[in-house]
Amino acid sequence: MEKWVIAAKRADFNQIGQQFHIDPVIARLIRNRDVIGEDKIREYLSGTVQELPSPWLMKDMEKAVDILEKKISQKAKIRIIGDYDIDGVTSTYILMKGLARIGADVDTYIPDRVADGYGIHAHLIERAETDRIDTIVTCDNGIAAAAEIQMAKDKGMTVIITDHHEVPYREEKGERRMVLPPADAVLNPKQYDCPYPNKNLCGAVVAFKYIAALYERFGVPAEELEDYYELAAIATVGDVMDLQGENRILVKEGLYRLKNTKNQGLQELIRANSLEDAKITAYHIGFVLGPCINASGRLDTAARSLALLNAKTKEEAARLAGDLTALNQSRKALTEKGKEEAIRIIETTELKNDRVLVVYLPDCHESLAGIIAGRVREKYHRPAFVLTGGETSAKGSGRSIESYSMYEELVKCADLMIQFGGHPMAAGLSIEEKNIEEFRRRLNVNCTLTDEELRPKIVIDVPMPVSYITKELVEQISLLEPFGKGNTKPVFAQKNLRVLDHSIIGKNKNVVKLKLLDPQGISVEGIYFGEAEDFVNFIREKDSVSVTYYPEINRFRGRESLQIIIQNYC
């Protein structure tokens, strides 16, 4: 059973409201997102990309720019090695387009998920040597590839790493010491001694910062960076970064530009998903457009997503957008099948008693492991790993909960794995099949999660009577967008609503439409998306219902009315 708690953060909400011309409820929502102080509130409400930190603050930026300035003047061959997910594809595109603009002799290689695996491997170094590549620039990978980088150095190549993943470390006398690869320059804000203020950039934004510094060095007008904002937004949301500070400003700007994008591929992807007349939000990136870009790297080759971004004609872009949208539909069906199998295994074995779930699906496509792990995590509110079969070993992904640092727990099991990497909330690994059971056992032995930490928590921003909702308040709530990780959609709550009427609607009969009455006698329309039958059975047995909700303006056939979207009930 979920635990409902009220965010009890304090501030003078009336004073903040008066100073910034916002409702005190909005001031409370901002405080609940840990935005504190006049400067931070002003940045949150009206920050612009012109105020973002200089790329030159990033450790090794000067060195990385100096290297490519020299290499470009020497007409040296440069290869970008990216990654097959949405962040890797957009990073590759940003670097490729940016370097070409300043005259670089540049090509790209995005590893195949199955044939190559994640990141830079020995055979990619050998291929670069065969192709007479002088300089390798990685994006969204490389920070954990010390051996491969050393191999490239031994062959006389120059290597620049741009990455955002956790920096490998070793424990020495109770202290963590970074284990950096021997690259010529490393751009990663997570380096302990990197002064760049935002440690939570995605790979594409690290790449964007590099291009911004290079453009400045080469005298390219700053306005030419504007085409990259939409890609930074797509990657930031698609790679599930916190929408706070710089990230939120970049996504806000990127969404604004995306609706009028000049990129043929993105135009056609928007059209293929029937969004050409929609107000595109972070939700559309996270759950519609982003999964299409990711789908090619999961089920085919990510080169198709890169080709979409590179498309020069409407016809080519439309064909690729259609292909990626169809691939995503296939991915959805395979994901559902894998999720159902994972749940069946958990429910029928001793796994159901584990605090950290490790599910082995030998016949599942390896690219779906992360998505299925996320679905399992959502259902059980426990850290979840899903492993899939491979030719020589199992591969998999993990998705975590806030109180469990997945990467740190993997470090404790490093001897059992062939390779691993990731973040506190997500990780990837490869492991010999014979070690899976010991991996599961050790993760659970090491696990210190309490029953309270494993109980899902619904944090209510404001207990607010529905009678307080106005069109003006709903419009002010939109100032808090874009919503996502780290800047969640507000949660309001109302007790004791009477259900005057209800009906199940929708093509799949999974939507409940309601007419509700609050204790003050104010009526409001409500909508519930979810297990419609369970909800209807609940309200039939009760005189009233308490709900968490989000208010909206329902626009239909030229008419506007207020309604609440019911999120949880009891």
Which functions belong to the PLM regions below?
Residues 147-151, 357, 372, 476:
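A short acidic, amphipathic alpha-helical/loop segment
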Residues 126-204, 208-217, 227, 244:
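Active-site cavity-forming subdomains of large catalytic enzyme subunits
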Residues 164-165, 365, 423, 511:
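Histidine-centered active-site/metal-ligand motif
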Residues 6-135, 155-156, 173-176, 182, ...:
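Hydrophobic helix-and-loop "lid/oligomerization" segment in the mid-to-C-terminal part
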Residues 70, 74, 316-360, 412-570:
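Mid-to-C-terminal polyanion-binding domains and interfaces
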Residues 1-3, 479:
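Catalytic domains of riboflavin
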Residues 112, 188-190, 388, 570:
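Residues at the C-termini of beta-strands that transition into short coil/loop
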Residues 177-178, 183-186, 392-400, 523-526, ...:
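Short, well-ordered strand-loop elements centered on a beta-strand within folded domains, enriched
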